[in-house]
Amino acid sequence: MTTSWYTADDCRLEDLRALVEQQTDRADYPHASDVEGNVLGYDARSLGNSRDVQAELARALMAGPGIVVLRGAFEPAVVDRATGVFFDLIAEQKAAGVVGGDHFAQPGANDRIWNALDKFALRDPRAFADYYANDTLALICSAWLGTGYQLTSQVNVVNPGGRAQVAHRDYHLGFMSQEQAQRYPAHVHQLSPVLTLQGAVAHVDMPVETGPTLYLPHSQKYGPGYLAFHQPEFTSYFEANHVQLPLAKGDAVFFNPALLHGAGTNHSTDVRRMANLLQVSSAFGRAMETVDRTAMCAALYPVLRSYEGSIENVVAASAEGYAFPTNLDKDQPIGGLAPPTQAELVLRAVAEKWADARFAEALHAQQDRRV
């Protein structure tokens, strides 16, 4: 970073090219199983969860290619059950005349479920728990964001013939016009990516013809990229030089939100390409969507009381893990610097085997104190 404020004049294609034409060296990433198209691949089933693994994943996202593929991250049977829930929700949306929008594609071209996280939890709490108990998901979220992260989810189905998205960066600054992004100093452009982790879980097998996401590895390191992706010459370069990798059902891709990317065109005739798009926010930032986490916790608690999977991972995916903002007149930090979080309440209730009614009363009382 050599400037305090980026402008459109700072966007030089040769600077981006110098970054993205470097090669990813697998020797620098000892836990990786392969490098394909400059993208690191990992076998999620044998990855482990050590701090060394977390450090390597974070380094790959920040200083490496900016993207990792975690193969076999989700069990196919767990994915299939979630897929059934998602298709039911899509059918209900269509019956109600709801047309899903898309930030970077034509409205109506795809089927989209916004706020899919809480819709999933309320529709089938057990399936939700089985899905989000996933250790690989928790591993990479905590590697990039630390504890207290907040999940949101949008399900995207690109139907046969669905066209590609325009290349872009993601939330926060990626959801601004070039003019808006210029209003933020350069150090905020560096900050924005570390507030969010982007991911996608493949819910069907995705050969290249179905249009899995296009990526430009190493592009997250380009300083003025939040301005550059609006410019035609950068779009053209992306279209000529992107990487596109096939995925199997249950594979997961995670990437730095500053990585230039975009969903591909579905050239197949019979594959509805479904992905669960995960946006994971730092406890210190705020997510794009509002999610009724109190309702989710109430729905999930009866499942969690006897759940044999990772309760901690399910709670991390559903409950509010940060104490603020809150009303400190009513929600005072007794015995510590901050009042208990919703996540702490859920875990305490499970550990102490509270009855459903007792938990529901405590949950809503806590929520009332926060406003």
Feature annotation, model-predicted:
Residues 10, 23-67, 71-178:
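Non-heme Fe(II)-dependent double-stranded beta-helix
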Residues 229-302:
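Catalytic core of Fe(II)/2-oxoglutarate
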Residues 81, 226-227, 265-267, 286-292, ...:
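Short conserved micro-motifs at the rims of enzyme active sites and ligand-binding pockets
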Residues 139-140, 165-166, 173-237, 242, ...:
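Catalytic core of non-heme Fe(II) oxygenases with the double-stranded beta-helix
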Residues 76-78, 159-160, 207-209, 222-223, ...:
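Flexible loop/turn segments at secondary-structure boundaries
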Residues 281-308, 315-329, 366-370:
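Charged, cofactor-coupling segments
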Residues 1-63, 314-325, 329-371:
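Fe(II)/2-oxoglutarate
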Residues 3, 7, 44, 49, ...:
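Active-site environment of non-heme Fe oxygenases that use a 2-His-1-carboxylate facial triad
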